[in-house]
Amino acid sequence: MAKRIAVCVGLLAVLTAAAPAVAQAQSAQAVLQAAAKAMGTNTLRCATYTGTGYVGIVGQNYDIRDDWARVELASYTRTINFDQKSAREERVIRQGSNPPRGGGGIPIQGDQRQIQLVSDRFAWNVNPANMLPVPQPQAAELRQLDLWLNPHGFIKAAMAPGANPVLITRYESGALGALVSTVQRKLNIISFTALGKYRVNGTINDQNLVERVQTLVPNPVRGDMNQEGEYTQWRDVNGVKFPGNFHHHTDWDDETQAPNYNGGHNSLTFTVKDLRINDCGEPIAVPDAVRTATIPPVQVQTTKLADGVYYLAGGSHHSVAVEFRDFTAVVEAPQDERRVLAVVEAVYKVIPNKPIRYVVNSHHHFDHLGGVRAMFHEGATVMTHRTNREFYKQEVLTYAPRTLEPDRLSLYPPTEFAEGYQLETVDIRGTISDGTRNLDVYYVQGSPHAEGMLMAYLPREKILIEADIYNPPAPDAQMPATPPPAAVNLMNNIQAYKLDVQTIAPLHGRVVPFAEFLKFIGKSGS
């Protein structure tokens, strides 16, 4: 009898413990159903919306403390087909009245048309010049995720079988312009896991409208990086409520809080001008070239520029290795860990048995910073401009867990580095030397591309190493009618520092004689 009582008590405890979870699940479904009814989500199969606004180019701010470099979104059209799990996005960007400072192709020359598509697990771009598909297998997962980060997509995904949404309620106050509001609103937060790993949170207000959708996405520099959309100015079209304004943050919107090491956060704002509901058109067909595409392997092509100096190309971003008596220095650790581990392997092949003691980081743009953590884990001291010190030390070179795409530094953190060996900063000039060879590092003053830009110079070999300032065009390309401001600025710095340059080893493009650079900027002679 005692045993039966114990079993009954145990079963009662299990049922009692399970009851709140069941109630919570039912509450989550009730909130979702109310939102779906209010928004007309159940009748929405597809939507096409057009508008204008601006784009913030993520990871390309001029100063690390600035917001993302901004360009005008002259036109934007997106069609989402929720049943097909597909989307087509076409936009035209131009420089507009935005300051021509920062990366990502700034200053934009004329209008640039961009076309991006996703269908289920396939992603591709379309080249506007010939309308041929360009496979983007590395972008497929995040583009698929993005289908569910808008209000209707969120509701559909959260209500899908197996989503297992949970509900929490909280009071929130928000920012009003630059001021923090003290008005608190009670809001419902629905949370579920998308694509097996992305925690997606939707904020539903007292009108049963989804006003915010937030998740984290992997980034080589930031790790688990905030991605969120805020939705306002709702309108009713054929019984479907749809936001008239989209505002997206990529990275945390913490501009009112100090310290703020990275100012970038506003990545997209546009106002909807036209909206078509359930006018789905023809289904998107996945091209054969896209279906068979795979992520290409990393290739590193090594070219000897001089004794102990190696150009490490083979992709869109390059590095340069310089051999010293008992160590090696590498200029640039770009893109991501995958690229840089291949670079490290290539360095040890041509310069064996010497550790990589330094990595020179040209600037803070994410495509040139993404592999710094891998070099740091390898044991290299990072040399960068002093402007970047706090951001790198506090937010980049950390051992914090990375849950979405763990890297070596987060998985296998090294013993704490001695003070001073994590970062070495440059103000105007720094030098890496073993007493017989110098690698001089200079601050590029007045660069329109990035504040804190560095370039490297080998005085004995007369080789200049630079990133994003001068990207040599093809040998048969026509010279620009007006030289780009960044290239002119490079020449000004070469003259100011009295550098005797014979060869430029750019970190994009190809190695060129200095005379070719002079021709590019409309000068002749030496």
Model-derived regions: residue spans:
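Gly/Pro-enriched, hydrophobic low-complexity segments
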Residues: 179-286, 454-459, 466-467, 472-473, ...
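Divalent-metal (often Zn2+) His-rich catalytic cores of metallo-beta-lactamase-fold enzymes
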Residues: 491-526
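Zn-dependent metallo-beta-lactamase
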Residues: 262-325
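Bacterial N-terminal signal peptides
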Residues: 8-18
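N-terminal mature ectodomain segment of secretory-pathway/periplasmic proteins
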Residues: 37, 41-131, 166-178, 337
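Conserved beta-strand hairpin/beta-sheet module of binuclear metal-dependent hydrolase folds
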Residues: 303-349, 453-472
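Flexible, processing/modification-adjacent segments and terminal tails
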Residues: 24-33, 103-113, 117-200, 206, ...
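Active-site metal-binding motif and surrounding structural segment of the metallo-beta-lactamase
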Residues: 338-383, 425, 496-502
